[in-house]
Amino acid sequence: MAAEPVSDGGAAAEKLISGREEFGDSSNLFSAILAMVLWLGAIHFNIALILLAVFFLPLSKSLLVFGFLFGFMVLPINEKSRFGRRLSRFICKHACNYFPITLHVEDMKAFDPNRAYVFGYEPHSVLPIGIVALADHTGFMPLPKVKVLASSTVFYTPFLRHLWTWLGLTPATKKNFISLLASGHSCILIPGGVQEAFHMQHGTEIAFLKARRGFVRVAMVKGKPLVPVFCFGQSNVYKWWKPGGKLFLKFARAIKFTPICFWGIFGSPLPFRHPMHVVVGRPIEVDKNREPTTEEVAKIHGLFVEALQDLFERHKARAGYPNLELRIV
């Protein structure tokens, strides 16, 4: 079973792309704030509407509000919408400039536009918003077809489901994952998912990876390279609080979402303008294996975890976090 970093045979083509340098000239603060509110404000907007309906409106108007929200839960989404594509490009451009986000690719030549890759992105944080640097609408990576696998809860949330679908997100089901890889899409996922958000700690980065091997198995079955990715600074763009305990964990698992109280500037959903550095490691080539054994999956999983840890250690000082610790749980 071969599993090693791959390149095109030449010297590694290290590349640094700054969101501010790429989009700074075409951005202004108002547009950036508007983009961030559209992208990240839907959760707070839904909560505000529900609170308004429950506590302040008469029954008839409350029912109207809930009917309105339900309508947006089931309204069909046109993934090829021209408006959706334009809005997505607007959000991606201004998001990369807002923080700003810098993308550091260790070997750009190692990525073939005609191949599909499995990106294992860490950490989850409150929201894994640094992923926008890898989106196809941003255009930083040389990959024409990219999808982000996200919790299915997103796709039952009014307004959010439309926006995030247009941004390239899709439900994180095994069937979806396999189908997308087979059709030539590169897939970005956060292996730790809901449980990683539950394990978050202030001042330390947590990657819930030890028990997460399903994404490795799928990559092996389809013969797609695994790519470690780490985002520095993402955990600082929101302040947050969450309850603890086994009951809360069971609830989070049941709804496939970790309900966290989080806030940004002036208590709003607008995140703090804290620089983020998204570091993309070299792909780990994996031989196609339709029926990998548990031991074979464990071996490749170990290589991925080791590559992620190494990526973190080599870049943390450069990203401005020399004393930061990454815990694999």
Curated annotation (Swiss-Prot):
GO terms for cellular component: endoplasmic reticulum membrane; lipid droplet. Keywords: Acyltransferase, Endoplasmic reticulum, Glycerol metabolism, Lipid biosynthesis, Lipid droplet, Lipid metabolism, Membrane, Transferase, Transmembrane, Transmembrane helix. The chain crosses the membrane at residues 37-57, 58-78. It is found in: Endoplasmic reticulum membrane; Lipid droplet. It is a multi-pass membrane protein. The keyword Endoplasmic reticulum applies. The keyword Lipid metabolism applies. GO terms for biological process: glycerol metabolic process; triglyceride biosynthetic process. Belongs to the diacylglycerol acyltransferase family. Involved in triacylglycerol (TAG) synthesis. Catalyzes the acylation of the sn-3 hydroxy group of sn-1,2-diacylglycerol using acyl-CoA. Can use oleoyl-CoA and linoleoyl-CoA as substrates. May play a role in TAG biosynthesis in different tissues in responses to environmental and hormonal cues. This is Diacylglycerol O-acyltransferase 2D. It comes from Glycine max.
